[in-house]
UniProtKB/Swiss-Prot annotation:
GO terms for biological process: delamination; epithelial to mesenchymal transition; neuroblast delamination; neuroblast division in subventricular zone; positive regulation of transcription by RNA polymerase II; regulation of inflammatory response. Residues 754-787, 885-906 are annotated as: PEST. Residues 70-91, 759-773 have a biased composition (Acidic residues). Disruption phenotype: Neonatal lethality: mice fail to thrive and most of them die by postnatal day 10. Mice display systemic inflammation, predominantly in the lungs, accompanied by enhanced leukocyte infiltration and alveolar destruction. Residues 1088-1096 bind DNA. InterPro entries: AKNA_Centrosome-Trans_reg, AKNA_dom. Interacts with DCTN1. Interacts with MAPRE1/EB1. Interacts with ODF2. Interacts with CAMSAP3. This is Microtubule organization protein AKNA. Its main location: cytoplasm.
Length: 1404
C-alpha cells in the first residue's frame, strides 16, 4: 500500500467547519498512482501544517503497523487511501473533511441500523448492537476516520472489508488481546474504525478503556494491523467507535509513524470493518454494560465507506461471533470477540463522518486511558437534567430499552448508574421534591421575615428622642425628629428632618401664620413636609401613600406644635383676645386643610390600588392611624382652646353688668358661643348664633371671670392636654390615653347609670308630666329633680337671672356643668330665639339672644354637648367659612364624623340608636330642637336656667352616653375643652356623675320647655325660625340650614325608613295591628308628636331617654306638648324618636308616640322598659302586652292573646277594642296615661273599623282616665282632632305603604344611622289573633289587673280566612317593606359612608 509521503495536513478553517479545533487530515501522497494527497472531501484545501503531536503519534502507530493483507480492492483502497484522516475528534460532521455523501450514507446507515436494531431488539445483545451501532453511526460518524478519498468511501470501505476478511484477527488477538477487537481497525482516537456493528454492538465495550489505545493499537497493528484499532465507540456498538482524545491521538500517531500503512493500512484500518472475516468471531459482543456510553469525543464517526453489500458479507461472520460470550469490560472486551451483527449493516458509504472538533484550539487529545475501568467510570459521566433523567427512566421499560433510548436519543449523555431504574428516578424525584419544599419553606421564612420587618418598622412622629417608654421599633434615633420614614419594601432610607420649621410648605399646608418662633421647640424638629418627602423619594416611590402619610404627619406635627405654642400663649394670657381668635381661626383653617388633605389622600388610596397595597402594610396602616389620631387630637386641642377662650369670654361677659343684667345664660352663651367661635359674632350651631353685638362684647379669653368650672377645665386643659413635664411624645400619648380613658369612662358611667337614670326619669317623667300638666305654663313648674335654686333661677326675673342664674349656673355647673349648658341652650334658645329674634339688641336682648344662641346652640349642643365633636365640627366649618359657627345638630366633630369614638357613624349606627346615641341625636337635631325651643315663649326664657338646665341636661344626658363618650373621647381628653363647652362637657360629666339628676333635670327641662314648647310646638317644624335670630344668627342659621337641610333630608329618609321598619315590625309583631285608621291616626299622631318633638328642644334630650318618652306621655294620659316636642326632636334626630306603632287599637296616635317612646325607652334601656312602665299606667294598660323589639328596642303593645276586648259587644276583632294586653301595665298605663290616645280614633287592622281609642276601649279609658283626669280632654281632644283632622297617619317611625304619608307634619328628622337601619330583622312576635284562628271563640282570659270581663273574640270562618288573608298580605307587605328598608338603609349607609366629605369629617 502506498503509504509513502503520507503527511498530515491541518484542516484549517477553510473547511468551513467553524472555529473547530485544528483538524488534521492525513493526506497520502500518491505512491504509484502519483495521486496527490487528498484530505477527505477537501483535503486539497487543507493547509499543510501538520500537527507535530499528531504526526508523532501517527508515526508511532505507523511504525508498529505490520503490512496488511490486502485484497485487490484493498490495494485500490490503499492507493486511494492516501487519505487525510481527521484525527481531531469533532462532534459535528461539519468538522470532518468527509464529503457530504459520507454524512448522508452514515445517516442512512444510522437509519438502517436503527431499524435493524428494532428488528433485533428482542435480544439484548442485538439491542446493544443496535444501540452501539446507532451510537457509533450517530456519534462516531464524526469521529470515524474518512475512507480513502481516492477510492471513494465505498471503495475504500469495501477494500477494507476484503482486507478484514483476509485478515485473521485471531492471530492478532493472540498477539495482543486488546487488539482483538481491532478487526474493525477503528481509531481508538475517535476516528471510528469501521467494524461490523454486530461486533461493536456485541461488545458494548464496557472495557472501552481496555480497548487498546491508539498508541497501543498502532503498535499492535503489526500483529493485527487491521485489528489494532478497537474503537471505544465499539463499546457503544455500531461500526463507529468513538475514541477518547488520547486514544484518538495515539491512533493517529500510529498511522503517522507508519506512513506505509497510513495510506493503506491506516486508511483501511480506519475504514476497515472489524472482523470482516469469520475469524472475527473472536470479536465477541460482550454486552457487559447496557449503557453504551459514547467516548468523550462524541460524534466521531468512522467513515462507513463499505457498501451495504460488503456489510452484509460480514454479517454472517458476526453472527457466528455473536455466540461468543461477551466478556466484562474489566476483561478488556476484545473488539472482535463480540457477536456479529445478525443483520446487514447499512451502506456506510452513504454515511458521512461527523467529526466534532473540540472548541479549544489548543486542545490536545488526552492520553488514552486504561480500558480496564468500568465503562461507566471511563466514559464521561454526563448528567442529564433531572427532568431528562426522569423522562428517560420512565420512558424506558428496562435497561435494554433505556440503553437503546439513551444510545439513540442521548448518545452523549449517560444516565448515572443511580438513575437507571425507575425506582432510582422516583427516589430522585422525591429528593428533588423535598429540596423544592425546603426551598419553599425557606422562601416562606424569608417572606415572614420581610413581613416581620415591615410590621416591626414603626414611624414615630415625635420630635423628642426616643423614650424608653416609647417602643421605638424603628431603632435608636440619633436626634429627635418628627418623622422617621422607612421604606418597608426597601428599608434603605430612614430620613430625619430635624428642622421642618424651615419648610415653608408645612406652614402653608397647615395654614399656620405664626412664625416658627411661635412654635414650641418640639415642633421645630424635622417634621417631614410634603416638600421634604422627595428627599425620601425612595420610600415615597415605593410607598407613595406612606410618603403622603408622612407628609401629612409632618404637617400635623407642625400644626400640633403651633397649637401647643398657641395654647401656651393663651393659657399664659400673653395673647389678646383678638389675636387669640385670629390665631385660633388660622389654626383651625390649617387643621381643616390638613383634614382635607388627609381625606383626599385616603380617597386616593382607595382609588389607587397600588397606594392601597402600599398602605396595606401594617406599618403604613399604623402611620395612617397615628396620623388620624393626631389630626383628631389637634381638632380636640383646638376645640379645647376654643372652649377655654369661650370660657374666658364667658367669665368676662358675666362680669359685665349689662351682661349680668341679661340672663345669666349669657355667660353660658359665651361658652357655647366660644365653643363655636372665640370672638366676633359667634354663630352658634342651629341658628343659635352667639351674637356678640356691641352690647355683647365677646369677653377676651383672658378675662378672669371664668366660672370655677371653666377655670378647672382650663387648668385641666393645661394639665391634661399637655402635661408639660412629659416629653412631647409621652405628652401626646398621655393625652390620648386620658382622652380614651375619659371617653370610655364616660361611656361606662353613662351606660351604667343609664338604667337608674331611666328609671328615675320614668318616675320623674311621670311626676313631671303631672307637674307639667299642672304647670304647663312657664317653667315655673319645677321638676322634682330641679334644684330649688335652679327653679328659682328659672323663675328669677331677668334682672335676677344674671346673678341667680349665674350662681345657680355655677352651682349647677359644679353639680352638673352639663345641666346648666343644656338648660341655657335649649330653654333659652327657643324662647331666646324668639325673644332675641327681636331686632333690639339691648343687653337683656343680647343676653336673651346669647341665651337663645346658647339655647339653640346648647340645645343642639345638648346632644352635641354629649358629642362635642359635632359642635366642634360645625365650629370648624364655621371657622373655615370664617363665618358664624354653624353646627349641624347631628354633626359631630370631624373626629366623631371620621369614625372616632364619637363618630357620626357611631351616632348613626344602629348601636348609636341606643337611647344615649339617640338622645344625642335628638339633642343633636339642634335645628328642630332649637326651633322648638325657639318657639318656646319667653317665660321659658325667663326661667332659662331651669329650663335650659333641665332640657339640655336631659338632652345632654340622653345624648351624652354616646356623644359624651365621643365628647369625652375628644373633650374629656382635654377637660379644658369640656370647660370651654362647659355645658356640654359639664353636662356630659354631670350626666356621668349624676345621670339620674341629669335625666330628671332634663326631663324637667323638657317638661318645662314642653309647656312652652306646647305653646309653640309648630315652631319646631320651622327650624329656620329659631335659627334666624339676628345678623350672625341668621348667617349661622343659614349655614346651619344648608347643612341642616341636607342632614334633615337624610334624617327624613332615615325617618321614613324607620317608619317603614316600625310599620313592618308592628305588622309582623301584631297580627292584629290597629286598624288602618288606628295606624293612620297613630301615625298622624306620631307625626304630630314628632312635630311637637321638633318644636320641643327638650324633647330631644328626653327623646333619647325612655323617661322622656314617659314624660311625653303624661300620667294624665295627656301628652305634654313638650314631650311631644321632645319626641319630635327625637324623631328628627333619630328614628327612635319615631313613635312605634302600637299594636293596641287603644294606643291612639299619642299612644303610639308614647308607646314608641316607651318602646324606645325599652329599646334604649330594656331595664327602663321594665321599670319604665309607670306604676300608675301599669294598672291602666295591663290587658295590653308591651314588648320591645330585640334589636330595634321598639316597644310593641299588643293585646295579649288572653286579653279580650272590654267591649263584649264590640266586634270580635280585638283591634276594634283597644288592646289591653296584660302588659306590665307600664306601657298600657303610659298609653292610658295619655288617655286621649285611648280616646283617639283607632282603626282596627282586622276589621278596619275606625274607633276612637276611648270608644274602642271604654274600660281602658277607665284606667287611662285615672291618669287622664288631670288633662283628660285637652291633649286628647287635640290629638283626636289632629288625628281626625289630619288624614289617618301611620306611625312616624315607619313608612306605611298602605297609609297616606303623614300630613303636612314636618318630616321627622330622625337621623338614622348610616349603618343599615335594620341590620337584624327585629324578632317578630307573632301573637295568635286575639280571637282564635278557628271559628271557635277563644276562651276569655282574665286580665292581669282588675278588668272588665273580656269576651272572647269570635270570628267566623270567613272572618278568620279574611284575617288570614289580611295577615298574609300584611306579612308580605312587611317583607316587602323590610326588603325595601334594607335596601334604603344600605343605600343610605353607603351614601353616608361615601359622603364623608359632605359630613365635614376629616377622619373616616
Amino acid at each position: 500500500m502506498a503509504s509513502s509521503g503520507a503527511k498530515a495536513q491541518w484542516v484549517g478553517p477553510s473547511l468551513g467547519q467553524g472555529p473547530r479545533r485544528r483538524r488534521w487530515a492525513w493526506a497520502e501522497e500518491q505512491d504509484t498512482d502519483g495521486r496527490r494527497d487528498q484530505g477527505w472531501g477537501n483535503s486539497q484545501s487543507l493547509p499543510e501544517a501538520p500537527s507535530p503531536e499528531l504526526l508523532e503519534d501517527f508515526r508511532r502507530a505507523q511504525e508498529h503497523l505490520p503490512p496488511l493483507e490486502w485484497d485487490p480492492d484493498m490495494q485500490d483502497s490503499e492507493e486511494s487511501s492516501g487519505e487525510e484522516t481527521e484525527a481531531d475528534d469533532a462532534s459535528s460532521p461539519e468538522g470532518s473533511t468527509v464529503p457530504l455523501p459520507w454524512l448522508s450514507r452514515s445517516n442512512q446507515q444510522l437509519d438502517m441500523s436503527e431499524e435493524e436494531l428494532d428488528e433485533a431488539s428482542g435480544r439484548p445483545e442485538v439491542d446493544l448492537a443496535g444501540e452501539s451501532c446507532t451510537e457509533l453511526e450517530c456519534e462516531d460518524q464524526g469521529d470515524s476516520s474518512p475512507p480513502p478519498p481516492g477510492q471513494g468511501p465505498a471503495k475504500g470501505w469495501v477494500t477494507f472489508i476484503k482486507q478484514g476478511s483476509n485478515y485473521r484477527p485471531s492471530e492478532h488477538l493472540e498477539a495482543q488481546p486488546s487488539v482483538e477487537h481491532s478487526r474493525t481497525k477503528s481509531w481508538s482516537s475517535g476516528t471510528v474504525s469501521l467494524r461490523q456493528p454486530s461486533d461493536s454492538l456485541g461488545s458494548t465495550w464496557e472495557g472501552d478503556t481496555e480497548v487498546p489505545q491508539p498508541s497501543i493499537l498502532p503498535k499492535a497493528l503489526p500483529q493485527s494491523p487491521c485489528h489494532n484499532f478497537p474503537h471505544p465507540g465499539d463499546r457503544n456498538g455500531g461500526d463507529v467507535a468513538p475514541a477518547t482524545p488520547t486514544e484518538f491521538r495515539d491512533s493517529l500517531a500510529a498511522p503517522a509513524q507508519n506512513a506505509e500503512c497510513s495510506a493503506g493500512t491506516w486508511g483501511e484500518e480506519t475504514t476497515s470493518l472489524p472482523s470482516s472475516r469469520p475469524e472475527d468471531q473472536t470479536w465477541k459482543r460482550t454486552k457487559t454494560s447496557p449503557k453504551p456510553l459514547p467516548s468523550r469525543f462524541t460524534g466521531s464517526v468512522s467513515p462507513l465507506s463499505t457498501r451495504l453489500g460488503a456489510i452484509k458479507k460480514v454479517v454472517p461472520q458476526h453472527k457466528q461471533g455473536a455466540t461468543l460470550a461477551g466478556h466484562s469490560s474489566s476483561q478488556a472486551p476484545k473488539y472482535g470477540r463480540g457477536r456479529r451483527l445478525n443483520y446487514p449493516l447499512p451502506d456506510f458509504s452513504k454515511v458521512g463522518p461527523r467529526v466534532r472538533f473540540p472548541k479549544d484550539e489548543n486542545y490536545r487529545p488526552p492520553k488514552s486511558r486504561g480500558h480496564n475501568r468500568q465503562q461507566g467510570s471511563t466514559r464521561p459521566l454526563i448528567f442529564k437534567s433531572p427532568a431528562e433523567i426522569v423522562r428517560d427512566v420512565l420512558l424506558s421499560s428496562g435497561e435494554a430499552s433505556l440503553a437503546k433510548e439513551s444510545s439513540l436519543a442521548h448518545t452523549i449523555t449517560r444516565v448515572p448508574q443511580e438513575f437507571q431504574t425507575p425506582e432510582q428516578a422516583t427516589e430522585l424525584v422525591h429528593q428533588l421534591q423535598e429540596d423544592y419544599h425546603k426551598l419553599l419553606t425557606k422562601y416562606a421564612e424569608a417572606e415572614n421575615t420581610i413581613d416581620q420587618l415591615r410590621l416591626g418598622a414603626k414611624v414615630h412622629l415625635y420630635s423628642d428622642p426616643p423614650q424608653p417608654s416609647q417602643s421605638f421599633c424603628s431603632g435608636s434615633m440619633p436626634q429627635g425628629s418628627k418623622v422617621l420614614s422607612f421604606s418597608i419594601p426597601q428599608p434603605r432610607v430612614a430620613e430625619w428632618w430635624p428642622d421642618p420649621a424651615q419648610d415653608p410648605q408645612a406652614s402653608e399646608a397647615t395654614g399656620w401664620p405664626f412664625p416658627r418662633t411661635d412654635l414650641s421647640p418640639s415642633s421645630s424638629p424635622g417634621v417631614a413636609t410634603p416638600g421634604r418627602l422627595p428627599q425620601s423619594q425612595g420610600i415615597a416611590t415605593d410607598q407613595p401613600s406612606t410618603g403622603q402619610t408622612q407628609a401629612l404627619t409632618s404637617q400635623a406635627s407642625r400644626l400640633l406644635a403651633k397649637v401647643q405654642s398657641f395654647e401656651e400663649l393663651v393659657l399664659a394670657g400673653h395673647l389678646p383676645p383678638q389675636d387669640q381668635i385670629k390665631s385660633l381661626e388660622q389654626l383651625r383653617a390649617a387643621h381643616m386643610a390638613l383634614e382635607a388633605e388627609y381625606l383626599q389622600a385616603c380617597r386616593e388610596e382607595l382609588l389607587d390600588p397600588q397606594l392601597d397595597a402600599s398602605q396595606g402594610s401594617p406599618r403604613t396602616l399604623n402611620l395612617c392611624r397615628e396620623l388620624e389620631a393626631e389630626i383628631y387630637h389637634l381638632g380636640q386641642r383646638l376645640e379645647e382652646l376654643q372652649d377655654h377662650m369661650d370660657q374666658t369670654q364667658r367669665e368676662t361677659e358675666p362680669c359685665r353688668p349689662d351682661l349680668q343684667d341679661s340672663t345669666p345664660t349669657m355667660s353660658f352663651l359665651p361658652q357655647s358661643a366660644h365653643l363655636s367661635m372665640p370672638s366676633g359674632p359667634v354663630s352658634l350651631p342651629d341658628g343659635q348664633t352667639y351674637q356678640e353685638p356691641a352690647t355683647t362684647t365677646t369677653t377676651s379669653p383672658g378675662s378672669s371671670c371664668t366660672l370655677p368650672i371653666n377655670k378647672k377645665l382650663s387648668l385641666s386643659i393645661k394639665t391634661e392636654e399637655s402635661p408639660r413635664g412629659l416629653p412631647v411624645p409621652l405628652r401626646d400619648r398621655t393625652l390620648q390615653v386620658e382622652q380614651d380613658f375619659h371617653g370610655l369612662l364616660e361611656r361606662y358611667l353613662s351606660v351604667k347609670s343609664l338604667p337608674e337614670a331611666l328609671r328615675d326619669e320614668d318616675e320623674d317623667d311621670l311626676e313631671e308630666e303631672e307637674e307639667e300638666q299642672d304647670h304647663q305654663g312657664p317653667l315655673e313648674v319645677d321638676s322634682p329633680a330641679t334644684a330649688p335654686g335652679k327653679t328659682e333661677a328659672v323663675r328669677v326675673p331677668p334682672g335676677e337671672r344674671p346673678t341667680q342664674a349665674e350662681e345657680s349656673h355655677r352651682d349647677a355647673t359644679q353639680e352638673d356643668e352639663e345641666q346648666m349648658g343644656p338648660m341655657k341652650s335649649p330653654d333659652f334658645r327657643p324662647s331666646m330665639a324668639r325673644d332675641t329674634y327681636t331686632p333690639v339688641l339691648d343687653t337683656a336682648e343680647v343676653a336673651q339672644r346669647g341665651t337663645k344662641a346658647m339655647v339653640s346652640h346648647q340645645s343642639s349642643l345638648t346632644s352635641l354637648e354629649e358629642s362635642r365633636p359635632s359642635e366642634l365640627l360645625p365650629r370648624k366649618a364655621l371657622l373655615r367659612a370664617g363665618g358664624p359657627h354653624t353646627e349641624e345638630p347631628w354633626m359631630v366633630s370631624p373626629e366623631t364624623d371620621s369614625g372616632f369614638v364619637g363618630s357620626e357613624t357611631s351616632i348613626v349606627s344602629p348601636f348609636t340608636q341606643t337611647p344615649e346615641h339617640r338622645l344625642s341625636h335628638v339633642s343633636t337635631s339642634g335645628p328642630s330642637a332649637q326651633h322648638l325651643t325657639a318657639s318656646v315663649p319667653g317665660d321659658r326664657t325667663s326661667h332659662p336656667k331651669a329650663r335650659g338646665l333641665m332640657v339640655p341636661r336631659r338632652a345632654t344626658e340622653t345624648g351624652i352616653p354616646r356623644s359624651r363618650t365621643q365628647q369625652h373621647f375628644s373633650s374629656l381628653s382635654s377637660p379644658g375643652r369640656g370647660a370651654q363647652s362647659c355645658h356640654l362637657e359639664e353636662t356630659s360629666v354631670a350626666k356621668i356623675a349624676v345621670p339620674r339628676s341629669e335625666f330628671k333635670r332634663q326631663k324637667q327641662i323638657s317638661k318645662q320647655l314642653l309647656p312652652s314648647g306646647r305653646t309653640s310646638p309648630d315652631s319646631a317644624p320651622a327650624p329656620t325660625a329659631a335659627s334666624t335670630p339676628h345678623g350672625s344668627a341668621e348667617s349661622t342659621a343659614n349655614l346651619l340650614l344648608n347643612r341642616t337641610e341636607r342632614d334633615q333630608a337624610i334624617k327624613d329618609l332615615q325617618a321614613e325608613v324607620s317608619r317603614l321598619r316600625l310599620q313592618l315590625e308592628d305588622s309582623l309583631h301584631r297580627p292584629h295591628p290597629d286598624g288602618p285608621a288606628c295606624v293612620a291616626s297613630a301615625f298622624n299622631h306620631s307625626t304630630q308628636t314628632q312635630e311637637k318633638l321638633g318644636s320641643s328642644p327638650s324633647w330631644g334630650p328626653h327623646y333619647g331617654s325612655k323617661s322622656t318618652e314617659r314624660l311625653s306621655r303624661e300620667p294624665n294620659g295627656v301628652e305634654p306638648a313638650e314631650p311631644m316636642g321632645r319626641r319630635r326632636a327625637r324623631s328628627s334626630s333619630v328614628p327612635r324618636d319615631v313613635p312605634r306603632l302600637y299594636l293596641s287599637s287603644e294606643s291612639e296616635s299619642p299612644a303610639p308616640r308614647l308607646s314608641s317612646e316607651k318602646s324606645r325607652t325599652f329599646e334604649e334601656h330594656p331595664e327602663a322598659a321594665q321599670w319604665g312602665t309607670r306604676p300608675q299606667s301599669s294598672s291602666k294598660r295591663r290587658e295590653r302586652v308591651s314588648f320591645r323589639g330585640q334589636y330595634t328596642g321598639q316597644e310593641y303593645h299588643i293585646l295579649s292573646p288572653k286579653a279580650i276586648l272590654k267591649d263584649s259587644g264590640t266586634p270580635s276583632c280585638p283591634h276594634c277594642h283597644p288592646i289591653r294586653t296584660q302588659d306590665t301595665g307600664s306601657a298600657v298605663s303610659r298609653d292610658t296615661t295619655r288617655g286621649s290616645s285611648a280616646a283617639d280614633t283607632l282603626r282596627c287592622a282586622l276589621c278596619g273599623e275606625v274607633k276612637s281609642s276611648a270608644e274602642a276601649d271604654g274600660s281602658s279609658s277607665g284606667p287611662s282616665e285615672k291618669n287622664t283626669p288631670k288633662k283628660p280632654s285637652t291633649p286628647i281632644l287635640k290629638r283626636k282632632n289632629r288625628q281626625t283632622g289630619s288624614p289617618v297617619r301611620m306611625a312616624p317611625g315607619l313608612w306605611y305603604l298602605a297609609a297616606a304619608p303623614p300630613a303636612p307634619a314636618p318630616p321627622a328628622l330622625a337621623y338614622i344611622s348610616s349603618a343599615p337601619i335594620m341590620p337584624y330583622l327585629p324578632p317578630t312576635v307573632y301573637y295568635a289573633a286575639p280571637a282564635p284562628t278557628s271559628a271557635q271563640t277563644a276562651s276569655p282570659q282574665p286580665a292581669r289587673g282588675p278588668r272588665r270581663t273580656r269576651h272572647s273574640v269570635q270570628l267566623g270562618l270567613n272572618d278568620l280566612e279574611e284575617l288570614q288573608a289580611a295577615l298574609r298580605e300584611a306579612a308580605q307587605a312587611a317583607e316587602n317593606v323590610r326588603s325595601t328598608t334594607r335596601q334604603l338603609s344600605r343605600s343610605l349607609s353607603a351614601d353616608l359612608r361615601h359622603a364623608r366629605s359632605l359630613r365635614g369629617s376629616c377622619l373616616f
